[in-house]
């Protein structure tokens, strides 16, 4: 028999599932047709047709006597060979992709010739790609100083230190801490790269002329004062709806009507304002000497605009008045000198609470009890009174009475204390003390 029959192809494909000794007993040589006449199975020549299984699949008519067998039904008889392996994601320890048939993959067929019975599970050659995290190139120049170990680690080429969480920020910080000169180079290169990148992108979207500088004439001081043409006459009725008052002094508008020709038209409103109001309104408002820089600057500008006045005498009078006022203000303010020997004191006033008679300050900012040498932190009268109330009841009662008596003298009718009154043992004593020092 030339070539390979379809039975041999099926048996070779399922050679791992079916033992070899059962082939002759399972496959018969003759089959009975519908009329009860047995006829031999025709042996087709498959040597010249490699797609025999796909073009002439076996069906239920061919294997009517063996439909009860689970291994030779029509479902498993039709061979569908996939073109791509589905288990190529596994890698071996040496970094080479392994064959999926070695891992027990379900895709045991291959893309080789089905008609050949030599091998039906030949895997293609694996292609190893470099470990690239992103498709775009790295634009930061700091990558030139580092060698990538994996997706999370890089090694510095200068000091061979490993930097985790490989990104441009961490690598730039490493250069900044350990390689200052190279860090300056990297920052300069990065700025230059970004400037060039921005220039290229702007040229792509906008047309930039070769000479971008404007040749329009620039008027000096045009942005300081608006351009105003000199007015020939000033008529208030043009701007305000008012009636003419016969009692109004018309001499106030003479200088508005005839401005000086020597004055620059651009600065004419400002100079006109100074000439009319500098000596009348501002000097009357600044009759008293001013110690602020604003007042002195206004006075200087007023004298500059009116040089005909007696500048020297007026300026001397202002300076003398300023000196007198400054001396008076300094004398009125009490001069406070910070103590240098006791830096822990927060206030310069004397402690008025009588509880301080039982405590003294320590060098660390706390206080020490004179009776029991106990240290009280955060020294204040409330903490001292609580210490006496817990540990020295007799002294606490005395201090409390002294404090109430002193408060009655300085602040009559007002008793502000965060410490409770003493608990007297004798009821009669408590009554007498309560009648003597009644708290309203």
From Swiss-Prot:
Residues 96-119 are annotated as: Disordered. Zn(2+) 1 binds at residues 156, 159, 174, 179. One of its GO terms (biological process) is regulation of transcription by RNA polymerase II. PROSITE patterns: ZF_BED. SMART domains: ZnF_BED. Residues 98-119 have a biased composition (Low complexity). Zn(2+) 2 binds at residues 369, 372, 387, 392. One of its GO terms (molecular function) is zinc ion binding. One of its GO terms (cellular component) is nucleus. Signal peptide: none annotated. A zinc finger (BED-type) spans 137-186, 350-399. Coiled coil: none annotated. The keyword tRNA processing does not apply. InterPro entries: Cuticle_assoc_protein, Znf_BED, Znf_C2H2_sf. It comes from the Eukaryota. Keywords: Metal-binding, Repeat, Zinc, Zinc-finger. Pfam families: zf-BED. May be directly or indirectly involved in cuticle function. This is Protein dumpy-20.
């Amino acid at each position: 028999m030339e070539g390979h029959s379809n039975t041999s192809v099926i048996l070779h494909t399922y050679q791992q599932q079916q033992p070899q000794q059962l082939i002759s007993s399972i496959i018969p040589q003759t089959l009975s047709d519908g009329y009860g006449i047995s006829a031999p199975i025709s042996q087709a020549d498959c040597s010249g047709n490699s797609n025999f299984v796909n073009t002439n699949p076996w069906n239920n008519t061919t294997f009517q006597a063996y439909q009860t067998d689970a291994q030779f039904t029509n479902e498993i008889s039709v061979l569908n060979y996939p073109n791509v392996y589905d288990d190529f994601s596994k890698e071996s320890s040496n970094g080479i992709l392994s064959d999926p048939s070695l891992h027990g993959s379900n895709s045991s067929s291959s893309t080789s010739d089905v008609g050949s019975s030599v091998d039906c599970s030949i895997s293609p050659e694996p292609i190893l790609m470099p470990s690239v995290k992103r498709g775009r190139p790295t634009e930061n120049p700091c990558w030139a100083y580092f060698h990538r170990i994996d997706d999370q680690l890089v090694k510095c080429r200068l000091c061979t230190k490993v930097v985790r969480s490989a990104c441009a920020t961490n690598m730039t910080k490493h250069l900044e801490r350990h390689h200052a000169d190279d860090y300056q180079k990297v920052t300069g290169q990065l700025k230059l790269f970004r400037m060039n990148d921005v220039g290229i992108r702007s040229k792509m979207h906008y047309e930039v002329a070769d000479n971008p500088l404007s040749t329009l004439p620039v008027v000096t001081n045009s942005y300081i004062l608006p351009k105003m043409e000199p007015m020939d006459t000033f008529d208030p009725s043009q701007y305000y709806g008012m009636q003419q008052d016969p009692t109004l002094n018309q001499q106030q508008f003479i200088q508005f009507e005839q401005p000086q020709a020597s004055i620059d038209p651009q600065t004419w409103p400002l100079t006109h304002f100074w000439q009319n109001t500098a000596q009348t309104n501002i000097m009357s408002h600044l009759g008293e000497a001013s110690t602020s820089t604003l007042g002195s600057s206004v006075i200087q500008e007023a004298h500059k605009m009116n040089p005909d006045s007696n500048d020297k005498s007026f300026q001397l009078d202002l300076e003398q008045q300023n000196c007198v006022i400054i001396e008076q203000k300094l004398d009125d303010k009490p001069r406070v000198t910070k103590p240098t020997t006791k830096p822990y004191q927060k206030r310069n006033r004397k402690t008025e609470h009588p509880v301080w008679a039982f405590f003294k300050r320590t060098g660390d900012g706390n206080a020490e009890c004179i009776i029991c040498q106990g240290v009280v932190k955060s020294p204040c009268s409330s903490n001292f009174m609580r210490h006496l109330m817990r540990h020295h009841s007799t002294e606490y009662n005395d201090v409390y009475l002294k404090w109430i008596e002193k408060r009655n003298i300085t602040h009559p009718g007002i008793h502000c204390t965060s410490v409770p009154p003493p608990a007297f043992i004798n009821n009669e004593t408590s009554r007498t003390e309560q009648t003597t020092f009644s708290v309203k």
